[in-house]
Design a protein with these regions (language model features):
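Base-recognition residues in the alpha-helical recognition helix of bacterial helix-turn-helix
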Residues: 24, 48-52, 60, 64
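Hydrophobic alpha-helical connector segments
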Residues: 60, 74-106, 158-165, 205-206, ...
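Hydrophobic alpha-helical bundle segments that form small-molecule/ligand-binding pockets
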Residues: 78-80, 122, 132-161, 176, ...
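Short secondary-structure transition hinges
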Residues: 96-141, 151
């Protein structure tokens, strides 16, 4: 039985791999379960054993990469002594994931450039909105902690700071997935993030030296 479960999981992973290949090649809307089954070397019935439909398969493809990173990345926010440093480390860690992991870039490239979120894929957009909302809550909580600690500069509110950082990150990742940034551009983005997050900080509330060193160590 143990081997059967192992084989079942192996088949599931093979189907997900095949779905990524097909989605990237011809787009999500044109991809049929028959085409994915052929790519995976399985029957259409084998796909239905693991996934109810293409939408569920698409969601599982995203969750396979997002799920393994979400907790690690979100933990960067948990910096009680310096919430703004936690925000910076979170943003830098997101960049590192895109620099280091081609598979992560591939999946999110499908999400951004290979799918129309209408008709049968409307539910997938709602699922992505849920992921976004979870991230937004973490970010807002971190900025609220920064404000409560007296870290937030007077020109910024919790809402304006969180919205600005979110727009920076979303635009950065969208362009990265469309145009394949290189290491030099990634370093420019790191510098931009440090400047942006630095502007959030009140002048009389400097980052702790060890916190700055930790942020820089993320890309050393």
């Amino acid at each position: 039985v143990r081997r059967t479960k192992s084989e079942s999981e192996e088949t599931r992973q093979r189907i997900l791999d095949a779905a990524e290949t097909v989605f990237l090649d011809i787009g999500v809307s044109r991809a049929s379960l028959d085409r994915i089954a052929t790519e995976a070397g399985v029957t259409r019935g084998a796909i239905y054993w693991h996934f109810a439909n293409k939408q569920e398969l698409f969601a599982a493809m995203i969750e396979r990469v997002h799920g393994q990173h979400e907790a690690v990345v979100a933990s960067s926010f948990l910096n009680g002594s310096d919430p703004l440093d936690g925000i910076l480390k979170w943003a830098l860690k997101v960049i590192e994931l895109f620099v280091a992991e081609a598979h992560t870039r591939q999946v999110y490239r499908i999400v951004v450039t290979r799918c129309e979120y209408v008709g049968e894929m409307q539910h997938a957009l709602e699922w992505q909105c849920d992921l976004h909302d979870r991230m937004a809550v973490n970010m807002r909580n971190a900025f609220e902690a920064a404000a409560a600690a007296g870290q937030l500069a007077p020109d910024w509110t919790v809402k304006s700071a969180a919205t600005t950082l979110e727009c920076f990150m979303s635009g950065m990742l969208d362009n990265w997935l469309r145009y394949d940034f290189d290491a030099e551009v990634a370093e420019t983005l790191r510098a931009g993030l440090r400047s942006l997050v630095g502007s959030f900080r009140a002048r009389d509330c400097a980052a702790h030296p060890s916190a700055v060193q930790q942020g820089r160590a993320l890309h050393a």
